[in-house]
Curated annotation (Swiss-Prot):
Pathway: Porphyrin-containing compound metabolism; chlorophyll biosynthesis. GO terms for cellular component: chloroplast. It is found in: Plastid, Chloroplast. InterPro entries: CHLI-like, ChlI/MoxR_AAA_lid, Mg_chelatase_ATPase-isu, Mg_chelatse_chII-like_cat_dom, P-loop_NTPase. Involved in chlorophyll biosynthesis; introduces a magnesium ion into protoporphyrin IX to yield Mg-protoporphyrin IX. It comes from the Eukaryota. Its EC number is 6.6.1.1. Belongs to the Mg-chelatase subunits D/I family. It comes from Bigelowiella natans. Keywords: ATP-binding, Chlorophyll biosynthesis, Chloroplast, Ligase, Nucleotide-binding, Photosynthesis, Plastid. This is Magnesium-chelatase subunit ChlI. It catalyses: protoporphyrin IX + Mg(2+) + ATP + H2O = Mg-protoporphyrin IX + ADP + phosphate + 3 H(+).
Length: 365
């Protein structure tokens, strides 16, 4: 199998080794919608990622980084910079496919699910990878230096302040996340590699909103607000202080809760294929999206997927009205047309139409 530049491999390994202990996910207080949206995307990555907007210092980055410890290790082909799956052809690089076809022995290793941060000043070459045209013309080989999309394959790609990122780069990220492949073309030379990841973006609305066309392509959207309750704020400060004082002992206190949630997620992933949505629920969801004047069908598709993931998370097989109610705002609010003359809150509008269609009023059940 093709050997890649060792300096690149060392770079990847060093970044992996430098990852510091993350604050435990189950120790986080508040921000329930953000945590739920992330978990549902882990259960079914086809939901399409999460975009969270909120005040500075509300824990957006902390929540995302704490998610990694809930994810199981993955099997990858050794010395392959694309995190190729040794079995699934859809998650293999071309080099691994060719090696398997030729009967070459494939060595595997287990790694932590990759979590890649995309820096704000990243160039397209840094994100997608670069082709050494000179070497390709002289040696006749496709000399490719993988980018961040290669590292993020089968993992999570996190973009903080995504609303400040160049629209062209956001388009590239969304295209790769949706299609599962990254294509790099230079001077008639083309490289294609798997790039299947959960895209998570965050930002501060005071610094500008994401364009509606791009926002619509994120599966779920969460508005995060600063926690106002004094007792909750004190509890957050105390937990952070205890974690900073001794991360090891703090993590040990949450080991059971972490393992419990991790098992719930793994079980939900396994049972997801068995969850069926009754036809009438599909009709009701479609009517909800139609009455809200949502453009396109992404809202319908994402809501159906998220409902199934939520049911699986709760160890059930049957969809209930309250399941749709719980997740609909996460899937639909960012797809609503903004009318500056309307005084009614958009999320309240969703609730009103939901009640009319589903005839469901016991929203606390």
């Amino acid at each position: 199998m093709k050997k890649y530049n060792k300096s690149f491999l060392i770079d990847v390994n060093c970044e992996t080794l430098k990852v510091r202990q993350a604050f435990p996910f189950t120790a986080l207080i508040g921000q329930t919608n953000m945590k739920l949206a992330l978990i549902l995307n882990v259960i079914d990555p086809k939901i399409g990622g999460v975009m969270s907007m909120g005040d500075r210092g509300t824990g957006k980055s902390t929540i995302v980084r704490s998610l990694v410890d809930l994810l199981p290790n993955i099997q990858v082909v050794s010395e392959d910079p694309f995190n190729s799956d040794p079995i699934d052809y859809d998650l293999m690089s071309q080099e691994v496919k060719e090696a398997k076809k030729s009967g070459e022995k494939i060595y595997t290793t287990s790694i932590k699910t990759p979590m890649v941060d995309l820096p704000l000043g990243a160039t397209e070459d840094r994100v997608c990878g670069t082709i050494d045209i000179e070497k390709a013309l002289i040696d006749g080989t496709k000399a490719f230096e993988p980018g961040l999309l290669a590292k993020a394959n089968r993992g999570i790609l996190y973009v903080d302040e995504v609303n400040l990122l160049d629209d062209h780069l956001v388009d590239i990220l969304l295209d790769s996340a949706a299609g599962g492949w990254n294509t790099v073309e230079r001077e008639g030379i083309s490289i294609v590699h798997p790039a299947r990841f959960i895209l998570i973006g965050s930002g501060n609305p005071e610094e500008g909103e994401l364009r509606p066309q791009l926002l619509d392509r994120f599966g779920m959207h969460v508005r995060i607000k600063t926690i106002k309750d004094p007792l909750s704020r004190v509890k957050i400060v105390e937990r952070r202080s205890n974690f900073d004082k001794s991360a090891e002992s703090f993590l040990k206190n949450y080991e059971y809760l972490q393992d419990f949630l991790k098992n719930r997620i793994v079980n939900a992933q396994g049972s997801l294929k068995d969850i069926k949505i009754d036809y009438q629920y599909k009709v009701n969801i479609a009517e909800l999206c139609s009455n809200l004047n949502i453009d396109g069908l992404r809202g319908d598709i994402v809501t159906n997927r998220a409902v199934k993931a939520f049911v699986a998370l709760n160890s059930r097989k049957t969809v209930l009205d309250k399941d749709v109610f719980t997740i609909m705002s996460l899937c639909l609010t960012h797809r609503l047309k903004k009318n500056p003359l309307e005084s009614i809150d958009s999320s309240q509008n969703i609730v009103t139409i939901f009640k009319d269609i589903f005839g469901y009023s016991d929203l606390t059940a």
